[in-house]
Design a protein with these regions (language model features):
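Membrane-proximal intracellular helices of multi-pass ion channels
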Residues: 1-443
């Protein structure tokens, strides 16, 4: 009898990348509707697709000013896409299943585990509920804290402003609705000296960017740092370093024309927002080349695993640096806090870093050649896209369709993650066979 072919099922990684793609397409179709634009016109598909991708991938790059071009309905669609992208498509889907009272299957639990990089399947439903409660609680508190600022400036409309910017900040999206027909793409530049708003936005960005698993660790163990998992310790320490060290460079190299207090605030805000969020309170095009180069590096590094942020992740950077330090000291194993890294983790980190740098350079160089723009400008936009940051030196709205498509691909790949993409495309096969060993000289 002929052997029957086994029915092939989508892997959890394939479901993740297809889920993101499906939400992006649905968002683009909704944004094309006349009701989505302030002028009640049909938005071209390429512009709607770019905006939807940027929202779902929590990036913040735009070709139309969010505050002046889109209607209230359009802004609500964008905010819903940001929330979906920030939580993750799989998290939202599992949440819908739970709210409907349906039982979560083992396959769905496994997909959720891969989506948020959870260490085990057990307890995944509890963790999902914790993520949802924590997300809405923090976003709600953020909105309340922003009310005094926006209601003072916009009256009753300030309520919507507070909700939108709280969610956008927590999800590390960088979208703002402060632009007007006469003053577009302003971001938070009008609040550069507002201490309260800057602090609230920075805290929302940091909390959203450290990851759901780190929240769970902190919530469970409170301030007992020694009890945290090694990953949580690395994330918190690396995040602190990547906030304060770049802030010192920004303070020294840029913003010299303002007072010490405002200069400190600008430097801190720029350091926090550059890795993940994409808000800006300063004129980025006027920053020094050193400042812009530091920003490119920060954008590529991104946030932390299982967070609302993109990029190659803080843990990837930490693992590579610690492995290099171990090599310099002629140590067999790399690790931190009395624990060593598995060799596969180091391989994964190197693969992710290589993938992001290839995408970054390929995207930037291609746009530069096609548009005839300087390489530094285009590398900046490419880093912003693949790191899902959203900062721009002002060239994105004027790019041709091909260059926009490149940025769309970079944003998408930057959000779904390097390993997710690799595992979705390449089948993983276990084999005990090994090739003969031969040494090769490197360096």
């Amino acid at each position: 009898m002929p052997e029957k072919h086994k029915r092939k099922h989508l892997t959890s990684f394939q479901m993740i990348i297809l889920g993101f793609a499906g939400v992006i397409l649905l968002g683009a179709l909704l944004l094309m509707l006349p009701v989505s634009s302030a002028e009640r016109v049909v938005t071209p598909f390429d512009q709607a697709l770019f905006t939807s991708t940027s929202a779902v991938c929590v990036t913040g790059l735009v070709v139309q000013d969010t505050g002046s071009y889109w209607s209230g309905f359009g802004q609500a669609v964008i905010l819903l896409l940001i929330q979906t992208g920030g939580l993750g498509v799989v998290t939202v889907a599992v949440s819908v299943f739970m709210l409907s009272g349906r039982k979560i299957s083992l396959m769905q639990r496994s997909t959720m585990q891969d989506a948020i990089s959870a260490p085990k399947v057990g307890g995944i439903v509890r963790l999902t509920k914790f993520i949802l409660r924590g997300t809405f609680l923090i976003e709600g508190i953020g909105a309340v804290l922003l009310l005094p600022v926006f209601c003072r400036d916009f009256g009753i409309k300030g309520i919507w402003m507070s909700i939108f910017h709280s969610i956008s900040a927590f999800c590390n999206a960088g979208f703002d609705i402060l632009g007007t027909a006469d003053n577009t793409f302003v971001s938070l530049s009008g609040y550069a000296g507002n201490f309260w708003l800057n602090i609230v936005i920075m805290l929302l960005i940091i909390i959203g960017g450290i990851g759901f698993l780190t929240w769970d660790d902190v919530y469970t163990n409170k301030l007992r740092f020694k009890r945290y998992r090694m990953q949580s310790k690395i994330i918190l320490l690396t995040t602190a370093i990547l906030i304060f060290v770049p802030a010192i460079f920004f303070f020294v190299c840029d913003f010299g024309q303002v007072s010490i207090g405002k200069r400190t605030l600008l430097s801190l805000f720029q350091s926090v927002t550059t890795r993940t969020a994409g808000f800006n309170t300063a004129d980025l095009s006027s920053m020094t080349e050193v400042g812009q180069a530091i920003m490119i590096l920060l954008m590529l590094m991104g946030g932390s695993p299982s967070s609302t942020a993109g990029g190659m992740k803080t843990t990837t950077v930490a693992v590579l640096l610690l492995n290099a330090f171990a090599t310099f000291r002629s140590r067999e194993d790399a690790g931190a806090f009395g624990r060593r890294f598995d060799s596969q983790v180091i391989k994964n980190a190197a693969t992710i870093a290589m993938l992001y740098f290839v995408l970054f350079f390929f995207g930037g160089i291609t746009i530069s050649v096609y548009e005839g723009l300087s390489l530094q400008l285009c590398l900046y936009e490419a880093a912003s896209a693949v790191g899902t940051v959203g900062l721009t030196l002002g060239i994105t709205p004027g790019l041709h369709i091909l260059s926009r498509l490149i940025l769309i691909v970079l944003m998408y790949l930057g959000r779904v993650g390097g390993l997710t993409l690799i595992y979705a495309v390449v089948s993983r096969r276990n084999t005990n066979a090994k090739m003969p060993l031969e040494k090769i000289t490197v360096g």
